[in-house]
Design a protein with these regions (language model features):
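Bacterial N-terminal signal peptides that target proteins for export
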Residues: 3-16
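Alpha-helical transmembrane segments
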Residues: 18-22
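C-terminal motif of bacterial Sec signal peptides marking the signal peptidase cleavage site
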Residues: 24-27
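Lipid interaction determinants
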Residues: 29-197
Length: 197
């Protein structure tokens, strides 16, 4: 401490030196108080409530028979919005119901039945999709292949999780899925894709 006094003595004769000393001490205290934030890539597992399986031949307009990947046969009621019934939330079916197609279903249980909230025809989702800036193929097994070599952040993987489509880390609601079009929505907007044949 004595050596600091010797060095700062000429500066302390004027008021400027005192100000400099106070600022130096304050800066040292500020550095001590800072804590470093650790960057971790910790993955949090999310419980997936989706039931996966194959659409059964017992499927009709108002019921979905699904043979689950575990081998169980479940029957979900499909609620529709029509003038005669007062359904608050109709079942959202995307991609159609075709016996033998792979399906992903989220739903809930009432007192006497299973009710489908969202049904995604995974077989219809597979294929080559294009838009103005995207050109990709959703393949079985969770792989996405991009046909645009210069794309900055191409999607490379996909999965259905709790009724939503995950492309890499981007989560989308499927607003529409048909034989020739796919509408995906997230916080950034609605994205339209056409099927490439």
């Amino acid at each position: 401490m004595k050596s600091i006094n010797v060095l700062l003595r000429p500066m302390l004769k004027g008021g400027m030196g005192l100000l400099f000393l106070v600022l130096m001490l304050a800066a040292c205290d500020a550095k001590k108080g800072k804590t470093q934030v650790e960057d971790t890539d910790e993955v949090v597992e999310v419980n997936d409530t989706t039931v996966y399986g194959v659409c059964g031949e017992g499927t009709s307009m108002h019921s979905l028979e699904i043979i689950t990947d575990a081998g169980d046969t479940l029957v979900y009621t499909l609620l529709s919005q029509d003038a005669e019934t007062e359904v608050e939330t109709p079942s959202d079916v995307q991609g159609g119901l075709m016996a033998g197609d792979k399906m992903a279903v989220t739903g809930h249980k009432t007192a006497d039945e299973l009710v489908a909230d969202r049904v995604i025809n995974v077989t219809s989702l597979l294929g080559h999709w294009t838009s103005i800036d995207k050109n990709f193929t959703i393949e079985e097994g969770g792989t996405v292949r991009s046909a645009v070599k210069a794309e900055t952040n191409p999607w490379t993987s996909w999965k259905i999780l709790n009724g939503s489509l995950l492309l890499n880390r981007d989560t989308f609601a499927i607003d529409g899925l048909s034989a020739d079009s796919l509408y995906l929505e997230n916080a950034n907007g609605i994205f339209t894709f056409k099927r490439q044949k």
